Amino acid sequence: GERPSRGRRDLRAGHAGRETAAAWDAFRAWAADELPASDAFAPGSGTPLLFGEALYLLPASSSLPLSPDHLAGLKVPRAGLHLGDVRKGRFQPAHALAMALGAPEAARVWTLGEDSPSAAAYLRGETLEVPADLRGWHLVTIACGGASFPLGWGKASGGQLKNHLPKGLRQHC
């Protein structure tokens, strides 16, 4: 389908039935494996909205109930939390989702030291070397002052952690 103009999205495009349900099911299946400790995406947590391949979650709120019908016809920059993109039936998580999570919620976490060369390499968008037995999506975090903070996603395979940090957020030095 046609993609909405950059920076603005028409909510009428996201109020589809079967495609949205299929995208939501793909996300829920991915989340069951990758985010087993998170209850943020349980039924009733919000309304899924699909724009092309991009899946968003419009949060539920008792104080301000919103639905796609309430927002129909409005131009909005982001219709909630960008969960990820569904391509060919497979879910790929969005950077915004990584930023919304804590390390305990993810099934697999790769933590970098705050002053480590690996942290600098990740922030430049480079692929990292990891143990060969690591597989799948990892929430990449940085350890700082006894806590871990999310940086983004990496996908491990064959001894490498492929960097999924958005290009616009990468450091150029």
Question: Which residues fall in each region the model found?
Answer:
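Polybasic, low-complexity RNA-engagement segments
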Residues: G1-C173
